């Protein structure tokens, strides 16, 4: 039956060609009818690709290339088939010549349209399998026909999908890199290894179908071109590859790669395969059976995934992509074989995963079951608790019912006894009545007997009446006594109840007192913790002081560095002064030369004038100037002496400063020692704090243990009371049983059994009492051990107090050291004052020297002006008198103009020096004002520091007082604990006495009960012995018994009064103890409040002291800065003084030279010449200039 014809699909025909040497040229790809140049290499290898459609599915023909014989086909399935799976067209059959003209219909793109693609196309893992196209296995043909189709290499059905994903696919990367190496064109041949690197824009995958349209249209244009597919083509781009030789590799590499792939293909042909796995496809018509989709583990699925991966990220043609797919599959076939070990491992892994899943499911189920059962469990627990409470209640009811049954049994026994006594009385009375009846019967017979009997009856009646009256009296007495006894019982019960209430009140009060004492102890521990916090604050203060000391050491280092810098600056200024001196000497030499020229002019004028009167006047003026010069020299010498003295003073001050620097170093060493001691103190404090924490924890544990011991003691005491009560009740039961033993033998046997049981219980109770006593002893021992531990803890606290005292001593030593530092600071300030005073003196002296120099300069300027006027007059006269000297006069006038310029320069220098002097004066005044302010601030600081030192001393004294008060309070607390212990002992004694009293009362009650029984027995005996015994004997016995009973009652009343008096005394003692404890507690609370207030005040004072110390530190820093500025001013003044001393030395040398000249016998003309010597004039000018500059 013919299938309907579907649309024709296109495949790719790939041919692998090997060209031996000398072989004819194979058909190559022709582009525009032109053959490419033949490659000169031997054994070339290539691939011929052709697209061909077979019944709506693409088909690939691969040919090995040996003279066009070796070829094989690969079917490419399209997942999107439009026709039926069995449709086959007659036009789509494979022709005999695989290289014939391809039909005009181009190959449409069957690439995948899925949006999921890998981001990097060079990735080697082939994980996706979402392509629509697929490659079938190779169909093996008969070996006789070399142009056969390949056999389909289907994998084993047992191999899972994971075999492809987990196997390493490095060969895929290499193959993809081979075929991605084109830059210019797409090479279809296998001429060499290609390394194509696509740009980033081409590697990106388009995320929609619209972005793929231009690529598909480009491919269609390539397929529709006439020159693209021609008859007998082998390579698609062989011409381009021949034009680009740079893309080719060596022939050896290309040959080796081609041979390797060909050998691998032949190996794949020769491998023995299972006939069930091999499908022989001799003709393309048989390929239509492969239209159904391949399973996810088959080779078709792998081919489809590879095709999708290679097709979706590249711009290559579909034929090249399919060729790459076939090559990748060739390289992947050996990797697809799964080893048995890996299959076993995978199977084991699958089993393990299955087991893990089962276990996880079981765990989830168990968790769910537990979650479901949790509310039921909670309900069951609640029900159990309720049932336990109900059981407890039922046990209590049983015990109550047992007590009621015992009481009812006791009452029944008493009733039985009373009934037995009444029956005995009834029997006795019946016997008497019978006897009387018999007597009456006997007496009825004779009359004499009647009379005697009547008399006897009368007598007996009288006796009976008397006995009845006596009996009534006795009964009344007994009733009265019984009433008295009941009243006494009620009073005793009330007294016992009141006594119990008082004891309970005392116990509660004792508990309250103990709780208050515990609270007071806790408060004391809190106070101790607060004191420790204060101690830590003090340590923080010490640390701050240490930091301040470090800052002072840093400041001293800064001062030293500033001192060195100032020294360097002084050296630089000295060098500058030397340079200025050299410049001044040069100027002096120039002035000397000028004065020599003026002297010559004056000599010429003098020779021309020869006026004796003028010469005399000039001589007088010269003498006056010489005297003034001598005076100036003397003043200069005095100034030199004063300067030397000042230098000595300054040297002394420098020595003092060096000593201060040494002291600063010593202080630094002391600071280091203090730091070491502080570190040790910190370590000690940490150890003490650790020990304190341990002691506090021990104290807490001891308190807890003490509380537990007290509770256990109370419980044991209550149990002892209960045991004693049970014992008394049992003794009473024994006594009652002994009373009942006088009944019958059966009752005695029962009572013996009961007594035996009760004795056994008594023994058990005695053993329990002994065990309780032993427990009490153990608890007492534990209590003693706890008291010992408490004593040790108190000793530890005392040790901590001692350590705190040691720390306080260390703080006092630090305070002393601080005071020493303050003293040294005060000494430094005093030295600063001395320096300021010396500076003021120097400033005053400099001002005086400046004033003197100003006066001298003014005089010299006036003299110079006079000399100038005289010289001008003489020059005018000389010009008038001698015209011959006109040229010389012109020269002199030029020299005078020069001198005038120099004088103007000197005047400007004087003006500048005066301005500098004024500024210096203003600076001095400002410095003096600052110094005064600093002195005042320093005095205020000293006063403030003294006040602070006093306050610190007072604070330290207060701290010592508080520590002493704390010690006293600790002692008081210890005394209170001792008193409390004594009170406890007294309370224990009172309890024992009360228990003794209770036992005595119970004994008295038992005696009373026994007496009542005896009275009843006596009554019965009296009733029974009325007719047999004489009344006198019975009455005497009854009276004696009554007397005994009265004596016993009196003795009991006496004992009762004694016990009441003792109880009252004990109550008074307890009240007194409670009052004392309350008073002591109030006193302790008051002291604690006072201590808290004092501590708060001390904290405030310490905070204020810290703030004041910080302010003093800031003021100290300011004072140090001002001292540094003052040092700089002093150094400037010292430099000026040195310059003045050098100037004075120069003046002295010049005066000595002038005196030597005076000693020589010179004429008046020579003296005149010496007066107008240029060196003298230059010296005068330089002296004035130097004085002004120094000012």
UniProtKB/Swiss-Prot annotation:
Residue ranges of the region described as Tail: 1149-1191
KW Transmembrane helix (keyword) present: no
Any one cellular-component term (Gene Ontology): myosin complex
MF annotations from Gene Ontology: actin binding; microtubule binding
Tissue expression profile of the protein: Lung, kidney and intestine.
Keyword Flavoprotein (UniProt): no
Assigned keywords, A-Z: Acetylation, Cell junction, Coiled coil, Phosphoprotein, Tight junction
Region feature Head, mapped onto this chain: 1-345
Quaternary assembly: Homodimer. Interacts with TJP1/ZO1 and SPEF1.
Description of its domains: Deletion of the TJP1/ZO1 interaction motif (ZIM) decreases but does not abolish colocalization with TJP1/ZO1.
Role according to the record: Probably plays a role in the formation and regulation of the tight junction (TJ) paracellular permeability barrier.
Protein's name in the database: Cingulin
Species this chain originates from: Mus musculus (Mouse)
């Amino acid at each position: 039956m013919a299938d309907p014809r579907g649309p024709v699909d296109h495949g790719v025909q790939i041919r692998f060609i090997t060209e031996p040497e000398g072989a004819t040229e194979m058909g190559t790809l022709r582009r525009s009818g032109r053959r490419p140049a033949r490659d000169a290499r031997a054994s070339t290898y290539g691939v011929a690709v052709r697209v061909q459609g077979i019944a709506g599915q693409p088909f690939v023909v691969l040919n090995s290339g040996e003279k066009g014989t070796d070829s094989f086909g690969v079917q490419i399935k399209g997942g999107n088939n439009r026709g039926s799976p069995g449709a086959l067209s007659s036009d789509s059959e494979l022709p005999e010549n695989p290289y014939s003209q391809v039909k005009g219909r181009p190959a449409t793109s069957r690439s995948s349209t899925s949006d999921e693609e890998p981001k990097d196309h060079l990735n080697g893992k082939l994980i996706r399998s979402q392509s629509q196209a697929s490659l079938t296995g190779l169909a093996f043909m008969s070996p006789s026909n070399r142009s056969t189709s390949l056999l389909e290499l289907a994998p084993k059905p047992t191999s899972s999908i994971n075999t492809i994903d987990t196997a390493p696919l490095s060969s895929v990367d290499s193959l993809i890199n081979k075929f991605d190496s084109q830059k210019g064109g797409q090479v279809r041949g296998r001429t060499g290894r290609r390394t194509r690197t696509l740009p980033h824009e081409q590697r990106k995958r388009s995320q929609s179908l619209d972005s793929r349209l231009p690529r598909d249209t480009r491919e269609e244009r390539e397929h529709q071109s006439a020159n693209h597919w021609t008859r007998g083509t082998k390579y698609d781009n062989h011409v381009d590859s021949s034009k680009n030789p740079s893309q080719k590799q060596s022939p050896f590499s290309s040959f080796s790669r081609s041979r390797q792939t060909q050998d691998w293909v032949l190996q794949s042909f020769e491998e023995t395969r299972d006939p069930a796995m091999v499908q022989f496809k001799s003709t393309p018509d048989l390929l239509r059976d492969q239209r159904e989709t391949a399973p996810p583990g088959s080779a078709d699925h792998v081919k489809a995934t590879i095709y999708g991966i290679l097709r979706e990220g590249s711009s290559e043609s579909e034929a090249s992509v399919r060729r790459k797919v076939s090559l990748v599959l060739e390289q992947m076939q050996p990797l697809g074989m799964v080893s048995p070990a890996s299959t076993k491992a995978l199977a084991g892994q699958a089993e393990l995963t299955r087991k893990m899943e089962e276990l996880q499911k079981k765990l989830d189920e168990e968790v769910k079951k537990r979650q479901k059962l949790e509310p039921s469990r909670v309900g069951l627990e609640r029900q159990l608790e309720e049932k336990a409470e109900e059981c407890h209640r039922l046990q209590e009811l049983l015990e109550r019912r047992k007590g009621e049954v015992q009481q009812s049994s006791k009452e029944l026994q008493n009733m039985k006894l009373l009934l037995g006594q009444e029956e005995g009385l009834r029997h006795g009375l019946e016997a008497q009545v019978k006897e009387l009846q018999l007597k009456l019967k006997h007496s009825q017979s004779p009359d004499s007997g009647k009379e005697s009997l009547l008399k006897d009856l009368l007598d007996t009646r009288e006796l009976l009446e008397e006995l009845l009256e006596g009996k009534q009296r006795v009964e009344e007495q007994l009733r009265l006594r019984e009433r008295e006894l009941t009243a006494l019982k009620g009073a005793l019960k009330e007294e016992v109840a009141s006594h119990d209430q008082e004891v309970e009140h005392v116990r509660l009060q004792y508990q309250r007192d103990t709780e208050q004492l515990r609270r007071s102890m806790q408060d004391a521990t809190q106070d101790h913790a607060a004191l420790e916090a204060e101690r830590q604050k003090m340590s923080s203060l010490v640390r701050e002081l240490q930091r301040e000391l470090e800052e002072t050491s840093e400041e001293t280092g800064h001062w030293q560095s500033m001192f060195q810098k100032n020294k360097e600056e002084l050296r630089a200024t000295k060098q500058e002064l030397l340079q200025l001196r050299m410049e001044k000497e040069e100027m002096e030499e120039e002035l000397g030369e000028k004065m020599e020229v003026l002297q010559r002019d004056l000599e010429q004028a003098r020779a021309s004038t020869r006026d004796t009167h003028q010469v005399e006047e000039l001589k007088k003026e010269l003498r006056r100037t010489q005297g003034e010069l001598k005076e100036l020299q003397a003043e200069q010498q005095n100034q030199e002496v004063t300067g030397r003295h000042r230098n000595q003073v300054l040297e002394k001050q420098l020595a003092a400063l060096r000593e201060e620097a040494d002291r600063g170093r010593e202080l630094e060493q002391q600071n280091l020692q203090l730091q070491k001691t502080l570190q040790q103190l910190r370590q000690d404090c940490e150890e003490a704090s650790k020990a304190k924490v341990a002691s506090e924890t021990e104290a807490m544990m001891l308190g807890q243990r003490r509380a537990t011991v007290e509770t256990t003691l109370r419980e044991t005491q209550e149990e002892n009371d209960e045991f004693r009560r049970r014992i008394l009740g049992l003794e009473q039961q024994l006594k009652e049983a002994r009373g009942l033993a006088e009944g019958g033998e059966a009752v005695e046997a029962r009572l013996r059994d009961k007594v035996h049981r009760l004795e056994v219980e008594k023994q058990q109770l005695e053993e329990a009492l002994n065990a309780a006593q032993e427990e009490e002893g153990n608890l007492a021992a534990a209590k003693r051990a706890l008291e010992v531990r408490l004593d040790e803890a108190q000793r530890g606290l005392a040790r901590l107090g001692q350590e705190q005292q040691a720390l306080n001593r260390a703080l006092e030593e630090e305070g002393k050291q601080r005071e020493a530092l303050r003293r040294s600071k005060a000494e430094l300030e005093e030295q600063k004052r001395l320096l300021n005073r010396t500076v003021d003196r120097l400033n005053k002296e400099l001002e005086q020297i400046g004033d003197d120099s100003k006066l001298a300069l003014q005089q010299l300027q006036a003299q110079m002006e006079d000399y100038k006027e005289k010289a001008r007059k003489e020059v005018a006269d000389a010009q008038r008198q001698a015209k011959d000297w006109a040229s010389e006069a012109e020269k002199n006038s030029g020299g005078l103009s020069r001198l005038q310029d120099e004088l103007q320069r000197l005047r400007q220098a004087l003006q500048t020096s005066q301005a500098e002097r004024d500024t210096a004066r203003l600076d001095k005044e400002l410095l003096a004002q600052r110094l005064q302010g600093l002195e005042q601030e320093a005095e205020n600081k000293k006063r403030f520091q003294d006040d602070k030192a006093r306050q610190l001393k007072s604070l330290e004294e207060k701290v010592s007082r508080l520590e002493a008060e704390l010690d006293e309070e600790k002692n008081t607390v210890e005394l209170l604990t001792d008193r409390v212990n004594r009170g406890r002992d007294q309370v224990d004694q009172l309890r024992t006495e009360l228990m003794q009293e209770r036992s005595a009362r119970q004994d008295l009650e038992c005696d009373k009960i026994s007496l009542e029984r005896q009275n009843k027995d006596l009554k019965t005996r009296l009733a029974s012995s009325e007719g047999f015994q004489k009344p006198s004997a019975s009455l005497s016995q009854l009276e004696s018994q009554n007397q005994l009973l009265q004596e016993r009652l009196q003795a009991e009343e006496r004992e009762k009064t004694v016990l009441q008096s003792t109880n009252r005394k004990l109550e008074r003692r307890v009240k007194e103890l409670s009052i004392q404890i309350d008073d002591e507690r109030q006193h302790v609370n008051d002291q604690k409040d006072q201590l808290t207030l004092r501590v708060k005040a001390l904290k405030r004072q310490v905070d204020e002291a810290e703030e004041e110390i910080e302010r003093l530190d800031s003021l100290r820093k300011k004072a140090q800065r001002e001292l540094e500025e003052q040092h700089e001013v002093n150094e400037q003044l010292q430099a000026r003084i040195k310059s003045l001393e050098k100037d004075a030395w120069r003046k002295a040398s010049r005066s000595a030279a002038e005196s030597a000249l005076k000693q020589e016998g010179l004429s008046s003309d020579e003296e005149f010449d010496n007066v107008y010597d240029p060196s003298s004039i230059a010296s005068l000018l330089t002296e004035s200039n130097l004085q002004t500059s120094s000012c």
